[in-house]
Amino acid sequence: MELDLLTAISPIDGRYRGKTDALAAYFSEFALIKYRVQVEVEYFITLCELPLPQLKGVDKGVFETLRNIYRNFSEADAGRIKEIESVTNHDVKAVEYFLKEEFDKLGGMDDYKEFIHFGLTSQDINNTSIPLSVKEALEQVYYPQIEELIAQLRTYAEEWANIPMLAKTHGQPASPTRLGKEVMVFVYRLERQLAALKACPLTAKFGGATGNYNAHHVAYPEYDWKAFGNRFVAEKLGLE
């Protein structure tokens, strides 16, 4: 079968695609691959900023060019990563090899490309990419729509402030109330729930195979890798 709205396995991608389409940029496989590329690129840049001794020669002017790899990430790029994965049988390793190809295209980066993914395990990439996708989906799609809903309900509550209506208790007619007040109840509830959601920390896992930066410490014991990891996650990804 050809994939369309009727043949999709999940109703999220089928029946309700019109409602969920905006989330494809955050939760599709294409999006996950793109976020993995972003994390790998930002990690490499952060190593250069440290800098590691072997990365002192990297021109800072190339950083924005490197960022354009994920900013301009295309379906063709994702397709290339899937081609590499068909050989590696490893999705994150395929991202690393793709980035090495992109470094080759830039020229002058051949001596540095082995530091892509230096000291990391796959879950360092997955457990930063996925919360980053959740963070950006909330900030760019979910929060704005909920805030728009709250604003519209508030408008109705003010417009209908003096419209009387019969209230009920236990399903039975009771004392009167006002329509605007009842709508305002939902404004209040939504505002509290939105504030609670925004207060939830979006956390990442980052620290090597077992969370101890073992490979990092063996290679470069003079650096504070725990501080490096915390700074990378907080400043470059906006996570905790």
Predicted regions, residues:
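A helix-coil-helix interface module used to build multimeric assemblies
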Residues: 1-216, 220-234
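Short, intrinsically disordered, charge-balanced linker/junction segments flanking boundaries
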Residues: 236-240
